[in-house]
Amino acid sequence: MLPFEKNSRIVFCGDSVTDVNRDYTAVPAGWGSFGDGYVNLVHALLTAVYPDRELMIMNEGVGGDDIKLMAARWDRDVLDMKPDYVSVMIGINDVWRHFDGPFRQVDLVSLDEFEHTYEDLMGRTEPRVKGLIVMSPFMMEPNRDDPMRAMVDRYAEVARQVADRHGATYVDVQAAMDHFLKKQSSYILSMDRCHPGIEGHMLVARTWLQAVGFDWERTTFDDEK
């Protein structure tokens, strides 16, 4: 059963996979604010199927963020929005920089720092919201021995552990991607194994909605019963 009460505020935060061309100048939950990815699809389905709930969806994803960059703006981007629920998907850039960053001398995020920072954010947020939703970072790479995929799995496991400690709903996006990749190539979903196209975003949105109890049989008239 969908847990979100009427007029709930749901903030989504993360990196470019959450951001996806959102208009930073738009008012929260206004035109252009949702981006072109899974957040927009979640918003559209919740609005169409649960019009009686009048849910406010806010996209606070920022392209390029790792967990430290996201944490630096947490108060402004998340807590100041007074959310009832917070959904987080972070980690792919924390991993990716280990592979594309050495010649740029970027500041890398270790697994321990990732866990410590994630734990701090969830610990600060849990008492102020009705619910937390933690989404796994993911990579559209079926070979689990691929070095980057293997590291993504380790960071995703940390995210799962943090979610468990804080009673958060855990959305295993990687598992959904792995199931798809048993049937089709990663190039159906992404050109770089990390940034989904619209098909990939639909898979992310569907996985998120299933995890939170979206009723796929509900009609737009059920609120009249």
Residue spans for each PLM region:
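Short glycine-rich His-centered loop
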Residues: 2-32
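Short, solvent-exposed turn/loop segments enriched in Gly/Ser/Thr/Pro and often Arg
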Residues: 61-63
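Alpha-helical cap/lid subdomain in secreted, periplasmic
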Residues: 3-6, 36-56, 65-224
